[in-house]
Every structure is written in C-alpha cells, then in structure tokens.
C-alpha cells in the first residue's frame, strides 16, 4: 500500500483536529460514547452505510454482518461509524421501490457529505439499494467499496429446486389455471425463500451486484457469494480492511468508474442474462459518473455479447448457488476474455485482468463458453419506432421466440385494476395474437415505473394452454420475470408519448431482428388523437411523490432526478464547520 495521505490530510481531521470549541465538542461527544481519543485520532473514519431493516428479509443478516465489517476496519487501523440508510425491500415497499431509488441516492450522498468520514462501505443488495447507494457515493466522491448482500439459498418444493420470483409467477399461473391446489400453493410459498439474502435467480439484485463487481466497486468474486456461506463473513471483514487502505491510497470512485469500466459492466450484464432493470440503473449510474451511455450502446452490446450464465430466468435450470460454486462472476468474466478491458482499475487496487488471474470454471453447463452460449445474443434488446421513439426494452432470451416477430391487435388498459379485472374474466374476448397494453405506469405516471410490465396471462388463455403472449407497457418488470414483455416505453404515456394515443384494435407490430416497434395507424389519425389527448392528473399531490413526478427523467436516460445529474450544477462544497 502506497500512502498518499498523512493523518492531518484526512477529511475527518477537519472535525476533530483543530484546537477550537467546535472541534472540542466533536471530541467530547465521541468520548461520550465510551471511546478514548487514541481510538480515532489520526485514523481514517469509515462510514458503513447499512441498509438493514426488520422489513427487509434480503438484508436480515446485515444486522450481524456489519460487525464483521467493523472488525475488518479496526484490524486495519481505522475507526468504524455505522450510519443506517433507507432500506428498500422489494418485498414490502409500495407502490414500488423505484420510487425511492433516487431518495436513497440523495440520502447516501448527504450522509457522507455531512458526517466526519474519510471513506465508506456500502451495504446493499436488494434490487434498488445497489444503484441507489452507488449513485449517491459517486456524487460524493469519497473512497468507497460495495458490499453485496449475496443471494439466498435455492428454494425447494417437493424435492424440486425453486427459483425466487420466477417460480412464483409460474406456479401462480398454474393455480389460476386450476392445476395447483391451495395446499400445494402453500408449500410453494413456504419453500421458495428459505434463508436471508436476495433473490437467487438472475433477477435485478443478482444483476446489479454483478454489475457493481464488473464496474470494479466490489472485492473480486464478492457479488455471487451466497449470503449464508461463511465466505460472505470473510468477504465482509475484508471489505473493512480494504477501505482503510483505500483512504490512505486516496483511491476514489472517479479513478475506477471510467468509460472502460462502464463498458465492462454492460458486457458482463449482457453475458449474465441480466434483468431489464439493469438498463435504467446502468444509465443512471453512468450519468452520475459523467460518462456517456445510451440505449444504443446497450443494444450494440446486446447484439455482440452472448448470454453465458445458464441461470434462471434466462437459463433453464440453475440458480445463483450453482453459479457461485461453478466459479462465480470471476469465471464468467474470464470467459469473456478480451471482450473486457482488462486494464480497468478496481477497488482492490489491481486491474481487472490481475483480479481474474487463476479464475476457473468448475461447471461448463452453468457458465457456458462463447462457443456454446445459452443465447446467441445478449440478454436485452432495444426497440424503436412510432410507439417508442426514444426506445423500449425486451429480454429476447426469456420469451417464446414466436414473439420475436409479431403483429396483432392491441387490448389497452389505463389502470392496473382495470387490467387485473379483465385478465381474471374467463370470458374475456382475447386471442393469443392480441397485444396486451398497460400504460400510465412510467416514471411520472406510475409514479416510479412499478413492476407491472409482466401482465398476467388472461385466464381465458391459460385454460387453453397458453403461457406467453406479447405484452407492452411503460412500466418495468421484476428481474425474475420472463415472457414476451416490451417495457420502459419512452416517452411514457403520462407525458404524451405515442403510447397514450394507442387504441383497442390498433395493430401493433414488432420485429426483434430489425429492432422496431410500431402501431400501424396513419399519421393523420394520430394527429387527430393527439389534438384530443388530455394529460392525466398526477397521482400524488404533495411531498416527495409530488417532487418525484416533476423532476424524474424518462426511462431512456435512467430516470434520475434532473437536479442530481452531473451536468446540472456544481457539486456541493465540503460543509462549513463552525
């Protein structure tokens, strides 16, 4: 370790070192907690942003795991300062955690700015906590390391493995079709999530922690360690030790989050069979780092980077436990080889290439080779056309190939309850060729782009044996979801995007190979409809939700707040201390 700072150069010294009344108060209040001066004087003070909560089962172990982080910090000669941060539980937070991703980003940035800290360990994992914490820490710019929660153990039902989320949708459809008893459903409920940790499919949580590692923000191999594995404890204490070194080295996010790192993260996301939610989060994180990333860049990567991780829902069999014991993300990145920029710096202080030395794959069916991929292209594709001028997203490998090229009449719903009532009507007049549409669920209209985009297959079609159909929305869907779902339509309908003009019976046409999505309605008719269109009222009339709807960007740029983007204005200065 090469020290680039002396103790008097530590940021926290501004609070504690001066011989004045204010600093005396800071020292006195620290001693009030039972600490002696020598425990923190001249040492890096490390913030631990802990997203533990009783309402977040994915982070249940963080209540104890934080002690392992503290142990590592103390071992390395630092002083830990645990700061609780907003815990975004995908299980409980409504209408959607995406409504609060930007709030967590704001909180993380301000927690780090306002406290006497020199570096940070970010403890997250469940879906939006990863981008929220990372976005805030990027904007603050202190040395930081990301500690992923890790996936839960695989589920079990009657001796068969269950994948969180993915099998919930699957078995619920069977219950709606009359093929599953109530008692059998209770067994599925009890067996699908049986330990702490985030979803063990390649959903949004596993996707985003993999992206964090590919960006260079975690220790090598950290992203796929199961939460219940003792290796997770050892990794946590190693994070504590390493962040102290990073402070002395002055290794800050802007040295790690380069264009090369972002390109690596995009390629890795595609190769993992990533969640569609990766799109809005990658765009937002890159923009926070001042790095250009567009939907076109993501689509280009999707055309050239095959899916290698045979993990559900894109894969057919395996779960994250299998992925980790097959070699984990290091093995997958090693197989990508020169498709990644091996010179990119990581929080370890080593280049990506150096961290991948010795990486092995122990199961070539779980982590495929470039010559034998799960899917010949990447996980995601971007469609554009008169229905989505700025873009829409689909996950081709996770849907029936019949729908890669399709046209059919639209069945349009303006609200979720309206759609829910229709799909539960066994007499609904619908065919497998219809395109089900839900609008009013985008960043402003939702608000927050709720995960409603995997519209349920209507009972009328389930009973005929159908399990997929084309669905279209300005909403998102869970990363554990699957099916022919076109999402993130931009501009959204709430702001007058073309989706707002679509009517029942209009023909919707998609062509995955051509990357197009259109409604076959002539321009004169669309002009008449636009003249008649009236913007819907906002759903929230005060407080944070009101602010969110007025400042959130569209999905094609990452749905961050306009006033938090890098180019909006000068970053806040260090706080005055009087």
Predicted regions and their residues:
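Glycine-rich phosphate- or other oxyanion-binding loops that anchor nucleotides, phosphorylated ligands
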Residues: 100
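Catalytic or ion-coupling anion/metal-binding cores of large enzyme and transporter domains
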Residues: 2-54, 58, 67-86, 91, ...
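A short, small-residue-rich loop immediately preceding and capping a beta-strand
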Residues: 113-133, 144-149
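Glycine-rich beta-alpha loop segments
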Residues: 62
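Short, well-structured alpha-helical segments in soluble
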Residues: 103-115
């Amino acid at each position: 370790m090469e020290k680039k700072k002396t103790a008097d150069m530590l940021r926290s010294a501004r609070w504690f070192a001066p011989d004045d009344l204010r600093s005396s108060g800071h020292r006195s209040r620290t001693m009030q907690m039972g600490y002696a001066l020598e425990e923190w004087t001249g040492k890096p003070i490390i913030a631990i942003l802990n997203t533990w909560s009783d309402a977040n089962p994915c982070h249940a172990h963080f209540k104890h795991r934080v002690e392992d982080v503290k142990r590592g910090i103390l071992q390395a000669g630092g002083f830990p300062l645990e700061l609780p941060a907003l815990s975004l539980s995908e299980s409980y937070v409504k209408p959607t955690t995406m409504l609060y991703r930007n709030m967590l980003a704001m909180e993380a940035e301000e927690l780090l700015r306002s406290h006497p800290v020199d570096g940070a360990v970010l403890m997250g994992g469940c879906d939006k906590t990863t981008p929220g914490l990372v976005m805030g820490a990027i904007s603050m710019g202190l040395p930081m390391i990301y500690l992923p929660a890790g996936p839960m153990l695989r589920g079990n039902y009657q001796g068969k493995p269950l994948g969180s989320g993915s099998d919930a949708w699957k078995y619920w459809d069977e219950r709606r079709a009359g093929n599953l008893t109530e008692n059998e459903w209770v067994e599925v409920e009890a067996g699908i999530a049986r330990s702490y940790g985030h979803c063990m499919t390649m959903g949004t949580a596993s996707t985003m922690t993999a992206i964090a590692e590919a960006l260079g923000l975690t220790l090598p191999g950290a992203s796929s360690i199961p939460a219940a594995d003792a290796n997770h404890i050892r990794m946590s204490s190693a994070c504590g030790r390493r962040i102290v070194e990073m402070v002395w080295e002055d290794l800050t996010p802007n040295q790690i989050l380069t264009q090369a790192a972002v390109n690596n993260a995009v390629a890795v996301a595609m190769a993992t069979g990533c969640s569609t939610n990766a799109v809005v989060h990658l765009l937002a994180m890159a923009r926070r780092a001042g790095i250009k990333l567009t939907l076109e860049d993501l689509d280009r990567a999707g055309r050239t980077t095959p899916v290698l991780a045979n993990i559900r829902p894109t894969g057919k069999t395996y779960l994250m436990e299998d992925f980790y014991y097959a070699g984990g993300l290091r093995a997958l990145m090693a197989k990508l080889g020169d498709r990644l920029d091996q010179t990119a710096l990581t929080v370890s202080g080593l280049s990506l290439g150096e961290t991948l030395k010795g990486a092995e794959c122990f199961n070539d069916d779980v982590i495929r080779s470039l010559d034998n991929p799960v899917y010949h292209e990447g996980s995601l594709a971007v469609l554009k056309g008169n229905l989505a001028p700025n873009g829409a997203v689909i996950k081709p490998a996770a849907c029936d190939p019949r729908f890669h090229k399709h046209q059919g009449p639209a069945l349009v719903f303006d609200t979720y309850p309206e759609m829910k009532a229709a799909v539960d009507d066994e007499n609904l007049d619908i065919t497998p060729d219809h395109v089900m549409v839900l609008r009013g669920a985008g960043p402003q209209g939702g608000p927050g782009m709720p995960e409603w985009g995997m519209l349920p297959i209507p009972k009328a079609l389930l009973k005929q044996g159908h399990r997929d159909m084309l669905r279209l929305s300005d909403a998102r869907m869970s990363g554990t979801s699957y099916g022919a779902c076109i999402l993130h339509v931009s501009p959204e309908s709430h702001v007058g995007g073309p989706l707002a003009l679509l009517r029942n019976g209009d023909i919707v046409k998609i062509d995955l190979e051509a990357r197009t999505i259109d409604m076959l309605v002539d321009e004169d008719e669309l002009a008449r409809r636009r003249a008649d269109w009236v913007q819907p009222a906002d759903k929230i009339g005060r407080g944070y939700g009101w602010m969110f709807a007025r400042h959130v960007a569209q999905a094609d740029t990452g749905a961050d707040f306009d006033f938090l983007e890098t180019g909006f204005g000068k970053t806040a200065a260090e706080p005055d201390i009087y």
